[in-house]
A protein has these predicted regions:
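Conserved ABC ATPase signature
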Residues: 120-124, 128
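Catalytic Walker B motif of ABC-type/P-loop ATPase nucleotide-binding domains
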Residues: 145-149
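H-loop (His-switch) and adjacent beta-strand-loop-beta switch element
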Residues: 194-206
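ABC ATPase nucleotide-binding domains
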Residues: 212, 219-256
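H-loop/switch region of ABC-family ATPase nucleotide-binding domains
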Residues: 181-182
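Conserved catalytic motifs of ABC-family nucleotide-binding domains
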Residues: 141
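Conserved ABC ATPase "signature" region
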Residues: 101-116
Length: 256
């Protein structure tokens, strides 16, 4: 793995009113490596991505991005007015300052949607939409891809192919990838590093180690089932070392 850091977050914390969104979260993203953030709904995953992208400011902590870093972003939610007549080619081209058919064809070929370029965007399936959004994210030759739930709306058969494509982008083009996903069984197969988040870092490391970690099992149970993803009631009666292991707080620390 290339050890040049593309972007990093250090000790990020954020609250909204009385609700703690993130507490003391740190991470680093490297070229040619996939870091996947997993966790239950409401764990702060999408917020964490927005902070790294500069779309939201934390209350404390620091954000660093490599100078001149080019980022391709696929958001969790995307809506296009179904009454707007737009081909896939035109939709991808909206991200360019000047329409460049050759570049559009190139990224469409990389993501497997070249045959869809003249189709209406509104006619696409969920899996096709995600591949088109990924093609658009590649237009400006990014060093880092930030993908928020790229498997959303994709059927079971298409999920494996989508994650295979993301892995190929990492291997063949050297992209760093920071991804949020709920598809635990596929994440564990595709990611180089996994960070389990529930407003704080529960555990992190290589997928196999994370899948055996007590905090991961506490959230998700045995295996990679996505059932029962409710947020556990978290009281700061512990903290974690750099490997995600639980360190009990002293009585003074837990009330401080």
């Amino acid at each position: 793995m290339n050890t040049t850091v593309l972007a990093k977050l250090e000790h990020i914390s954020l609250t909204a009113g009385q609700r703690e969104i993130l507490h003391d979260v740190s991470l680093e993203v490297y070229p040619q490596s996939i870091l996947t953030v997993i966790g239950p709904n409401g764990a702060g995953k999408s917020t964490l991505l927005k902070i790294l992208l500069g779309l939201r400011k934390p209350d404390s902590g620091s954000v660093w991005r490599k100078p001149g870093l080019s980022i391709g972003y696929v958001p969790q939610k995307f809506h296009l007015d179904r009454l707007l007549p737009l081909t896939v080619e035109r939709f991808i081209g909206l991200s360019l300052p000047r329409f460049d058919r050759m570049r559009i064809s190139e990224v469409a070929g990389i993501t497997g949607v070249a045959h869809l370029l003249q189709q209406a965007f509104q006619s696409l399936s969920g899996g096709e939409v995600q591949r088109v959004l990924l093609a658009r994210a590649l237009l400006n030759q990014p060093e880092l891809l930030v993908l928020d739930e790229p498997g959303q709306g994709v059927d079971v058969n298409g999920l494996g192919e989508l994650y295979k494509l993301i892995n190929q982008l990492k291997q063949h083009h050297g992209y760093g990838v920071l991804m949020v996903s709920h598809d635990l069984h596929l994440v564990m197969a595709a990611a180089d590093q996994v960070l389990c988040l529930n407003r704080h870092i529960c555990c992190s490391g290589q997928p196999e180690a994370v899948s055996r970690h007590p905090e991961y099992l506490r959230l998700f149970g045995n295996g990679y089932s996505t059932m029962g993803l409710g947020v556990y009631a978290h009281h700061h009666d512990h903290k974690h070392d750099i490997h995600g292991s639980v360190i009990p707080l002293t009585k003074e620390q837990s009330h401080g």
